[in-house]
Regions:
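Local sequence-structure signature of Cys/Sec-based thiol-disulfide redox active-site neighborhoods
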Residues: 10, 14-52, 128-143
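Catalytic cores of large soluble enzymes that bind and process phosphate-bearing ligands
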Residues: 4, 37, 78, 97
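N-terminal leader/targeting and pre-domain segments
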Residues: 1-25, 101-133
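N-terminal, well-ordered alpha-helical segments
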Residues: 39-46, 67, 78, 103, ...
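Non-catalytic, surface beta->alpha helical segment in thiol-disulfide oxidoreductase systems
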Residues: 79-117
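Short coil/turn segments at secondary-structure boundaries
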Residues: 36, 56, 93-96
Length: 143
């Protein structure tokens, strides 16, 4: 069953064909045990893959592929990493990317493909001053 409307499919195919320059890897971590939204998340990813040949999938089992879990520092499932062909930008989505999160994952795919972001020059300048690793976490609720 399709999760995206036909209108959304047409829009996203056009958007991706016009705006994706470089290949993007979706790295998906699932778990066979106790993963409430792994199936639905995989269904969304499968639909995204059908929209552009510049998007590919690498899939891991959180419980079995422990080296990959360690390499990508994955904390829970379902987990989606949006990465470039040869670079992991640290973008992680935990849980199902539905609602407002779907728009965010589309933006992440476009930004990774174009090796850009939406940061101002001033913000980029300030970020260059940071000398220690840090972790930004954004929590979203539908209310």
């Amino acid at each position: 069953m399709a999760l995206l409307s036909e209108e959304d499919v047409v829009y996203l195919k056009k958007e991706f064909s016009e705006k994706l320059k470089e290949n993007v890897k979706i790295i998906f971590f699932k778990s066979e045990d106790a993963c409430m939204y792994c199936k639905e998340t995989k269904d969304i990813i499968t639909e995204l893959l059908s929209l552009s040949d510049k998007i590919s999938l690498i899939e891991y089992d959180f419980d079995k592929d422990r080296e990959a879990v360690k390499k990508y520092v994955v904390k829970r499932t379902p987990a989606i990493i949006v990465a470039g062909e040869d670079k992991d930008y640290g973008i992680r989505f935990y849980g199902i990317p539905a609602g407002h999160e779907f728009t965010t994952i589309i933006t992440a795919i476009k930004n990774v493909s174009n090796k850009t972001g939406n940061l101002t020059e001033n913000t980029l300048s300030k970020l260059k001053e940071i000398t220690k690793p840090f972790n930004i976490q954004v929590f979203i609720t539908p209310t």
